[in-house]
């Protein structure tokens, strides 16, 4: 059997695979904020990015390595293809971390070998020991992945895994790259690897999966029963296509059904020892932070973190819950950090009080960003009688979007009504500090604002999505706006909140435009799709 650390290790790849979701690109400050929250959550490994992809990705991984973790914190991991330039860039980026890992991979399925890598099995068998050994020359902790393992020939897969372990790999990852496999098949695959790889006892067995058939979490739980001891997942299940296995669902399944899973770890069913090191009370906070910063809205009926996850509409259910919550609830909402607590901050509250609450919510702002957030808080306090944590999260989340801001919104004025043509006057401050104003008509107030902004910024794009939701209850609630725009096939999202949804829409659109402009001219390399941009000798 594979090496057993005595519990399930949680490998979070929100900042790498999760960020590959269309429109979910994050800037350096946003990535750092998420990494700091992941450390509070208690994940074992943070895959901080793909350093070779771009200078921006390298800088973000390096910043996280410098600022997150510590001797008692998570391992900081970087992804690299089986290529010396990739591996060297990864090693340099993660170098500042006290605990670091290089995660390198190569495809093993015949379809990938023939159509993507254009290599033979023998060539792959030659590459694996060279690249794992090269990674091992930089760090003690090396993870090796067999890309598309779920569709690979088993005998060849066993051979590759054995070779990777003998070359120094500490963790072997088995990805279901295209979300194709079913739970029973995945369980059998993990069991077969345990039974047919002679040196598997020298490495931890890990799994990585996508949700194309909606089976990622079920697949992982079956893998755990058969010896997998590291789960690679993302907050809110974000990721390419249909997403990745959702961290919060995996954690709570192992938490709520501990008595079922305990025997697979050699424990008695009643053992109270947690199966992971994750602090479940940080789950909701982590989910909201990732949703706010990526602009990817969590579906209301999403398990564990959706708005309806703990809601009861049926009269029969409501009656049962009022008598005893266990009648219809298997999870106490407080276990995942969900509460309706109001923050006792008002007009006379100081910056230190606001900073303390923000830190509790997972935000660590610098002085300038704190001042901006505090100003917005005071403005909101003048307009709202009660301010909730959700309000505070909404008004502060866009502060970490500003470091790359090339356009700043200064003024929005709208005139509209039943007998008026919607008209917007907008003033924007450019990178050079020059103010420009435009007036535009539209089919509605938001359309007029967007047209005015387009005439000022001159950044062609296609508006793909516009959504508004209320942050809290009440007529004075903040309106949270998410906007997605597209240029050249790439999606960029913007997010903002205000009691005036037109103002929120204008700021969200500006935030999306800033992401678009910042990304223009510095396209990142995709770790699985872009092979031409690497020295072929190293693959």
Curated annotation (Swiss-Prot):
Residues 8-269 form the Pyruvate carboxyltransferase domain. Homodimer. Its main location: cytoplasm. Coiled coil: none annotated. NCBIfam families: leuA_bact, PRK00915.1-3. Its cofactor is Mn(2+). Mn(2+) binds at residues 17, 208, 210, 244. This is 2-isopropylmalate synthase. InterPro entries: 2-IPM_HCS-like, 2-isopropylmalate_synth_dimer, AIPM/Hcit_synth_CS, Aldolase_TIM, LeuA/HCS_post-cat, LeuA_allosteric_dom_sf, LeuA_bact_synth, PYR_CT. Its EC number is 2.3.3.13. HAMAP family: LeuA_type1. The gene is leuA. Catalyzes the condensation of the acetyl group of acetyl-CoA with 3-methyl-2-oxobutanoate (2-ketoisovalerate) to form 3-carboxy-3-hydroxy-4-methylpentanoate (2-isopropylmalate). It is found in: Cytoplasm. Residues 408-539 are annotated as: Regulatory domain. Keywords: Amino-acid biosynthesis, Branched-chain amino acid biosynthesis, Cytoplasm, Leucine biosynthesis, Manganese, Metal-binding, Transferase. GO terms for biological process: L-leucine biosynthetic process. It is an enzyme of class 2 (transferase). It catalyses: 3-methyl-2-oxobutanoate + acetyl-CoA + H2O = (2S)-2-isopropylmalate + CoA + H(+). Pathway: Amino-acid biosynthesis; L-leucine biosynthesis; L-leucine from 3-methyl-2-oxobutanoate: step 1/4. GO terms for molecular function: 2-isopropylmalate synthase activity; acetyl-CoA C-acetyltransferase activity; manganese ion binding. CDD domains: DRE_TIM_IPMS (cd07940). Belongs to the alpha-IPM synthase/homocitrate synthase family. LeuA type 1 subfamily. It holds the Pfam family HCS_D2. One of its GO terms (cellular component) is cytoplasm.
């Amino acid at each position: 059997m594979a090496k057993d650390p005595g519990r399930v290790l949680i490998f979070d790849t929100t900042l790498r695979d999760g960020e590959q979701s269309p429109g979910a690109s994050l800037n350096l400050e946003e990535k750092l904020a998420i990494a700091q929250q992941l450390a509070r959550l208690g994940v074992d490994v943070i895959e901080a990015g793909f350093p070779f992809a771009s200078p921006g990705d390298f800088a973000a991984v390096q910043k996280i390595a410098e600022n997150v973790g510590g001797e008692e914190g998570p391992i900081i991991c970087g992804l690299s293809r089986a290529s010396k330039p990739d591996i060297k860039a990864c090693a340099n980026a993660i170098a500042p971390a006290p605990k670091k890992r290089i995660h390198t991979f190569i495809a093993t399925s015949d379809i990938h070998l023939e159509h993507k890598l254009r290599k033979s099995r023998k060539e792959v068998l030659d590459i694996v020991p060279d690249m794992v050994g090269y990674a091992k020359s930089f760090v003690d902790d090396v993870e090796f992945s067999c890309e598309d393992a779920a569709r690979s020939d088993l005998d060849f897969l066993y051979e590759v895994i054995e070779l990777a372990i003998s070359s120094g790999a500490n963790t072997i990852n088995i990805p279901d790259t295209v979300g194709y496999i079913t739970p029973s098949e995945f369980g059998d695959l993990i069991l077969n690897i345990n039974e047919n790889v002679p040196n598997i006892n020298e490495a931890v067995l890990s799994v990585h999966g996508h949700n194309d058939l909606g089976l990622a979490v079920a697949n992982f739980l079956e893998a755990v029963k058969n010896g997998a001891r590291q789960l690679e997942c993302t907050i809110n299940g974000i990721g390419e296509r249909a997403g990745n296995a959702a961290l919060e669902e995996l954690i709570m399944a192992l938490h709520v059904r501990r008595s079922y899973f305990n025997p697979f770890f050699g424990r008695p069913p009643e053992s109270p020892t947690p199966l992971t090191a994750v602090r479940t009370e940080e789950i909701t906070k982590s989910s909201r932070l990732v949703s706010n910063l990526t602009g990817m809205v969590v579906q209301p009926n999403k398990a564990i973190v959706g708005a309806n996850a703990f809601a009861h509409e049926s009269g029969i259910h409501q009656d049962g819950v009022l008598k005893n919550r266990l009648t219809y609830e298997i999870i106490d909402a407080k276990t995942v950090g969900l509460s309706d607590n109001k923050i006792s901050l008002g007009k006379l509250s100081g910056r230190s009080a606001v900073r303390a609450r923000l830190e509790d919510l997972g935000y660590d702002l610098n002085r300038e960003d704190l001042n901006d957030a505090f100003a917005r808080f005071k403005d909101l306090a003048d307009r709202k009688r009660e301010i909730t944590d959700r309000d505070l999260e909404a008004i502060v989340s866009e502060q970490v979007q500003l470091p790359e801001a090339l356009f700043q919104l200064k003024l929005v004025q709208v005139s509209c009504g039943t007998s008026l043509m919607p008209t917007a006057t907008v003033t924007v401050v450019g990178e050079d500090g020059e103010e420009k104003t435009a007036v535009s008509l539209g089919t509605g107030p938001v359309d007029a604002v967007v047209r005015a902004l387009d005439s000022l910024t001159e950044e062609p794009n296609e508006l793909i999505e516009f959504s508004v939701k209320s942050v809290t209850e009440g007529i004075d609630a903040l309106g949270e706006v998410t906007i997605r725009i597209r240029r050249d096939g790439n999606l960029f999202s913007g997010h903002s909140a205000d009691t005036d949804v037109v103002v929120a829409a204008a700021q969200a659109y500006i935030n999306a435009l800033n992401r678009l402009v910042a990304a223009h001219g510095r396209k990142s390399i995709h770790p699985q799709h872009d092979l031409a941009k690497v020295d072929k000798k190293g693959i």
